[in-house]
Protein backbone atom coordinates (compact mmCIF):
# COMPACT_ATOMS: atom_id res chain seq x y z
CA UNK A 1 0.00 0.00 0.00
CA UNK A 2 1.28 3.45 -0.95
CA UNK A 3 1.52 6.31 1.51
CA UNK A 4 3.14 9.69 0.97
CA UNK A 5 3.87 13.01 2.61
CA UNK A 6 5.18 16.34 1.41
CA UNK A 7 6.93 19.00 3.42
CA UNK A 8 8.34 22.43 2.64
CA UNK A 9 10.09 24.88 4.91
CA UNK A 10 12.37 27.90 4.94
CA UNK A 11 16.05 27.24 4.26
CA UNK A 12 17.08 27.93 7.85
CA UNK A 13 19.54 25.67 9.65
CA UNK A 14 17.21 25.33 12.65
CA UNK A 15 14.67 23.58 10.38
CA UNK A 16 17.09 20.72 9.64
CA UNK A 17 16.19 18.91 12.87
CA UNK A 18 12.47 19.47 12.17
CA UNK A 19 12.86 17.81 8.77
CA UNK A 20 14.83 14.90 10.21
CA UNK A 21 12.28 14.18 12.96
CA UNK A 22 9.29 14.60 10.64
CA UNK A 23 10.63 12.14 8.07
CA UNK A 24 11.59 9.68 10.82
CA UNK A 25 8.09 9.85 12.31
CA UNK A 26 6.56 9.14 8.89
CA UNK A 27 8.92 6.24 8.14
CA UNK A 28 8.30 4.72 11.60
CA UNK A 29 5.11 3.11 10.26
CA UNK A 30 7.36 0.54 8.54
CA UNK A 31 8.79 -0.49 11.92
CA UNK A 32 12.42 0.05 10.87
CA UNK A 33 15.30 -1.00 13.06
CA UNK A 34 17.03 1.70 15.10
CA UNK A 35 19.93 1.51 12.63
CA UNK A 36 17.66 1.96 9.62
CA UNK A 37 15.90 4.91 11.23
CA UNK A 38 19.21 6.50 12.25
CA UNK A 39 20.52 6.14 8.69
CA UNK A 40 17.42 7.80 7.24
CA UNK A 41 17.60 10.65 9.76
CA UNK A 42 21.29 11.16 8.97
CA UNK A 43 20.64 11.23 5.23
CA UNK A 44 17.84 13.77 5.65
CA UNK A 45 20.20 15.94 7.72
CA UNK A 46 22.91 15.76 5.06
CA UNK A 47 20.59 16.50 2.13
CA UNK A 48 18.80 19.36 3.89
CA UNK A 49 22.07 20.87 5.10
CA UNK A 50 23.42 20.72 1.52
CA UNK A 51 20.30 22.52 0.26
CA UNK A 52 20.56 25.24 2.90
CA UNK A 53 24.32 25.83 2.85
CA UNK A 54 25.21 25.10 -0.76
CA UNK A 55 21.92 25.48 -2.64
CA UNK A 56 20.78 28.67 -0.98
CA UNK A 57 24.06 29.95 0.51
CA UNK A 58 22.27 30.25 3.88
CA UNK A 59 19.60 32.55 2.43
CA UNK A 60 16.56 31.90 4.67
CA UNK A 61 14.22 33.06 1.89
CA UNK A 62 14.85 29.82 0.00
CA UNK A 63 12.46 26.89 0.38
CA UNK A 64 13.51 23.26 0.87
CA UNK A 65 11.05 20.65 -0.40
CA UNK A 66 10.88 17.08 0.90
CA UNK A 67 8.69 14.26 -0.38
CA UNK A 68 8.54 10.78 1.08
CA UNK A 69 6.70 7.90 -0.55
CA UNK A 70 6.44 4.53 1.15
CA UNK A 71 5.50 1.61 -1.05
CA UNK A 72 6.13 -2.12 -0.66
CA UNK A 73 8.57 -1.61 2.21
CA UNK A 74 10.65 0.87 0.23
CA UNK A 75 11.23 4.47 1.29
CA UNK A 76 11.51 6.90 -1.62
CA UNK A 77 12.85 10.20 -0.33
CA UNK A 78 13.29 13.36 -2.39
CA UNK A 79 14.99 16.54 -1.17
CA UNK A 80 14.84 19.49 -3.56
CA UNK A 81 15.93 23.12 -3.60
CA UNK A 82 15.62 25.89 -6.15
CA UNK A 83 19.05 27.31 -5.39
CA UNK A 84 22.29 27.79 -7.30
CA UNK A 85 22.59 24.20 -8.52
CA UNK A 86 25.68 22.04 -8.89
CA UNK A 87 27.97 22.68 -11.86
CA UNK A 88 29.74 19.30 -11.69
CA UNK A 89 27.75 16.56 -9.92
CA UNK A 90 30.49 13.93 -10.28
CA UNK A 91 33.00 16.22 -8.60
CA UNK A 92 30.53 17.16 -5.84
CA UNK A 93 29.99 13.46 -5.05
CA UNK A 94 33.70 12.84 -4.43
CA UNK A 95 34.62 12.25 -0.77
CA UNK A 96 36.01 15.36 0.93
CA UNK A 97 34.99 17.69 -1.91
CA UNK A 98 33.47 20.95 -0.71
CA UNK A 99 32.81 24.33 -2.27
CA UNK A 100 33.01 26.00 1.13
CA UNK A 101 36.27 24.99 2.84
CA UNK A 102 36.09 28.13 4.99
CA UNK A 103 33.12 26.58 6.81
CA UNK A 104 35.24 23.60 7.87
CA UNK A 105 32.68 21.19 6.44
CA UNK A 106 33.89 17.67 5.80
CA UNK A 107 32.63 17.29 2.24
CA UNK A 108 31.19 13.87 3.11
CA UNK A 109 27.46 14.55 2.59
CA UNK A 110 26.98 12.61 -0.64
CA UNK A 111 29.33 9.84 0.54
CA UNK A 112 27.24 9.38 3.68
CA UNK A 113 24.04 9.32 1.61
CA UNK A 114 25.52 6.68 -0.71
CA UNK A 115 26.64 4.50 2.21
CA UNK A 116 23.30 4.62 4.05
CA UNK A 117 20.86 4.35 1.15
CA UNK A 118 20.31 1.69 -1.50
CA UNK A 119 20.13 4.24 -4.30
CA UNK A 120 21.13 7.90 -4.66
CA UNK A 121 20.43 9.95 -7.79
CA UNK A 122 21.37 13.63 -8.02
CA UNK A 123 19.97 15.95 -10.67
CA UNK A 124 20.97 19.58 -10.83
CA UNK A 125 20.94 22.58 -13.10
CA UNK A 126 23.01 25.68 -12.44
CA UNK A 127 20.84 28.58 -11.21
CA UNK A 128 17.75 26.33 -11.13
CA UNK A 129 18.39 24.00 -8.21
CA UNK A 130 19.15 20.45 -7.16
CA UNK A 131 17.04 17.37 -6.53
CA UNK A 132 18.39 14.39 -4.60
CA UNK A 133 16.45 11.13 -4.97
CA UNK A 134 17.13 8.52 -2.29
CA UNK A 135 15.78 5.00 -1.92
CA UNK A 136 16.02 2.54 0.95
CA UNK A 137 14.52 -0.92 1.45
CA UNK A 138 13.35 -1.51 5.01
CA UNK A 139 13.89 -5.08 6.24
CA UNK A 140 10.62 -6.96 6.67
CA UNK A 141 11.74 -9.43 9.30
CA UNK A 142 13.43 -8.19 12.43
CA UNK A 143 15.77 -10.27 14.57
CA UNK A 144 14.25 -11.22 17.89
CA UNK A 145 16.21 -10.69 21.08
CA UNK A 146 16.24 -13.51 23.63
From Swiss-Prot:
SUPFAM superfamilies in UniProt: ATPase domain of HSP90 chaperone/DNA topoisomerase II/histidine kinase
One Pfam family here: HATPase_c_2
Biological process, per Gene Ontology: asexual sporulation; negative regulation of sporulation resulting in formation of a cellular spore; sporulation resulting in formation of a cellular spore
Reaction catalysed by this enzyme: L-seryl-[protein] + ATP = O-phospho-L-seryl-[protein] + ADP + H(+); L-threonyl-[protein] + ATP = O-phospho-L-threonyl-[protein] + ADP + H(+)
Organism superkingdom: Bacteria
InterPro entries: Anti-sigma-factor_SerPK, Anti-sigma_F, HATPase_C_sf
Protein keywords: ATP-binding, Kinase, Nucleotide-binding, Serine/threonine-protein kinase, Sporulation, Transferase
Molecular function GO terms recorded: ATP binding; protein serine kinase activity; protein serine/threonine kinase activity; sigma factor antagonist activity
Gene3D superfamilies (alphabetical): Histidine kinase-like ATPase, C-terminal domain
E.C. designation(s): 2.7.11.1
Stored SMART domains: HATPase_c
HAMAP family hit by this protein: Anti_sigma_F (MF_00637)
Record's function text: Binds to sigma F and blocks its ability to form an RNA polymerase holoenzyme (E-sigma F). Phosphorylates SpoIIAA on a serine residue. This phosphorylation may enable SpoIIAA to act as an anti-anti-sigma factor that counteracts SpoIIAB and thus releases sigma F from inhibition.
Family per similarity comment: Belongs to the anti-sigma-factor family.
The protein's name: Anti-sigma F factor
Amino acid sequence: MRNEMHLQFSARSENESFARVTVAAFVAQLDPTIDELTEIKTVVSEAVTNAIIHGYNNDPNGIVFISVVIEDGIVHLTVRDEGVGIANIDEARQPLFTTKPELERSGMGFTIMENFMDEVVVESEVNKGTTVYLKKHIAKSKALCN
